[in-house]
Amino acid sequence: MDRRHFLKRSVATAAGIATTGVVATDASAKTVKVKTRLEYGQTIKEPSRRIPVVDSADLIVVGGGPAGFAASVAAARQGLDVIMLERGYFLGGLFTGCDVTLLNNMYSPTHNGRVQAVFGICDELCNRLDSHKMMVWAGTPPNVDTEATKYFMEEMCVEAGVRILYGAHASEVSMSGDRIDAVFVETKSGRVAMKTNFVIDCSGDGDVLAWTGEDFIEYKNHISAMYR
């Protein structure tokens, strides 16, 4: 096979794989036959199975973004056994994952933006960042190092006794009457269930609320640099 035929065959094969994932070639390799695409609407029946209950907690917080972080730390400090489910592998969500370094709305726009308007757990986090020179007042509001923010968020959770589960994607809830009694979680080990008395939905999309069947209003943000 010369170079021209090799390249021709390689391109055709790659195109077929990208299209359907299934490729058949004849013996001469002059033609490539691609199987027809699957039609939309087809379904596959998933066999029923019993889901193992692997843990339980007073409170399960779904999502490890800024809201989930604050909710988990606050609840754990009040003595609750807290499990935080984070589908990624760091805390902070879009704040740290997308390098949103500005602490918007934490400081008042008056008096050169140096009048603090937000306190509490966020203030504690900022104090840790500032003490390690990971907060820069290059303008108003200040900028923070997002990698350091991930670290200190986790540190505060661990100190409070929050049990963080990374790579854990909440996918459904189990209801007992009008109350959630368990959360189904997709993990690297498969689907598992975790029992709980309370759930705080910090998914960013209101997923848990939707799964319960409660009424909600769907609001779609315009795609922009502000709403990612």
Which residue stretches match the model-derived regions?
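Glycine-rich loop(s) and the adjacent beta-strand/alpha-helix scaffold that form part
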Residues: 201-228
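Conserved beta-strand-loop-beta-strand element in the redox core of flavoprotein oxidoreductases
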Residues: 176-192
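Mobile, glycine-rich extracellular loop/lid and propeptide segments
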Residues: 66, 169, 196
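Core beta-strand elements of the Rossmann-like FAD/NAD(P) dinucleotide-binding domain
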Residues: 55-57, 190-198
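N-terminal Rossmann-like FAD-binding beta1-loop-alpha1 element of flavoenzymes
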Residues: 59-80
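Ligand-binding pocket scaffold of soluble enzyme catalytic domains
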Residues: 67, 96, 189-193
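Extreme N-terminal leader/targeting segments of oxidoreductases
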Residues: 2-58
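Conserved N-terminal/central alpha/beta ligand/cofactor-binding core
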Residues: 11, 74, 80-81, 86-179, ...
